[in-house]
Amino acid sequence: MWTYVLFNIKSNLKRKENLILVVLFIICEIALLFILNTKSFTESPYQTSLGISIASVSQKNDPKLYQEFMDEVNLIRQTIDKGEQDGKEKNWKSYCEYKVKVSVLEAQWYMVTSNMPNDSYFEHADVLEQLRKEYGLPDLSQYEKLIVQKSNDINLYFCSMQQARYFDYLLKHDLTPITYSYVDASSVSLQIARYILPVVLPLLVGLLLFQQRERRAKTEKTILTISGVKKKYVRWNLISDVLFVLLVVFMPILVYMIVLVPFKGVSNLIYPVLYYKPGFTGFHYWDTQGLDHIELVASGLTNMSVNQFTTPGMELMPLWQCTLFVAFGIVMSTTFYVLLITVLSKLMKNKYLSLLVFLVVLGLCSFASPLGNMQKINTFNPMSYRDFGMNLLGTSYFGYF
């Protein structure tokens, strides 16, 4: 039967209308890569630091300790000034070291000034303490008695904590910071997966396969008369259709990767990306405030939320592993789309009607589940998981699996 699958794939590739669709798909991908590559030159990994806020401290409790604290704050400000200059001059190693130091101190200060219980909110506090000792940084908790009023706002802790871990990873793996739109052999598959495939993949499946019902109708009538063959025929047709679409999706990506290797290499395969860990444990719904209220900070190939309470759930993952998970998502989504168009083509005798219903169903499901949608019912909406990159990397409301 694998011979039949191969025959089906070859016959699909030879069809003129399919070739036109594949060419248009490749043109869209190449155009996207050129746009992203151009955009990456205007972006910069450089980020400013907030520093240590002194609004909540007072010298009344201990003037001498207050003076020591202000001396530390001035040293931190000098570190920020030098680090920001390193960033502007693209001295990335010194810049990363500065970001680790300042982010660790910021995160520790947010812990000190917050009245939230440490065990409930301050994840990775042990990692931050380890980094503080490793980089020879002062312990800001000794200045806790200077605080007049503690705060309930812990969102900035999350951001600083992740920044510290992110830039420490870059330093220890001798990696240069890259931007959100960066394109090389390591990142090309992720960029295509999050910019093109969420919209184009269902269209590609529908347009490539909607004529299959008509072409196979006569064969199916003959197969019906042969006992035990019909199920195998349907099964192998499904397999060939899925493999055909996956071939159309993955072959160009593989070619792009091979072409880009001589220009930028593959060193970024170990580049860290942030992913949403709770999304790997099951259907997970983010109990957050809505995307309209979220400030996103770019951390390499991922965006990180400043004011989302779910940010502590973010962990670091090497890019090669992220790429494998995204590829798995593409396979699963393709299988779902092929099954749906196959069922509709069986139920409806008119190929145009089945295509229309296919697109309308997916369109309505997508409309019902935008990224800012807060209804838990959409946990079971398949189109909530249409953006493989965003589901995995934590800027969608729904976990990856």
Regions found by a protein language model. Name each.
Residues 25-29, 241, 359-363:
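Residue-level recognition of pore/gate-forming positions within transmembrane alpha-helices
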Residues 4-8, 13, 210-244:
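Helix-loop-helix units of permease transmembrane domains in multi-pass membrane transporters
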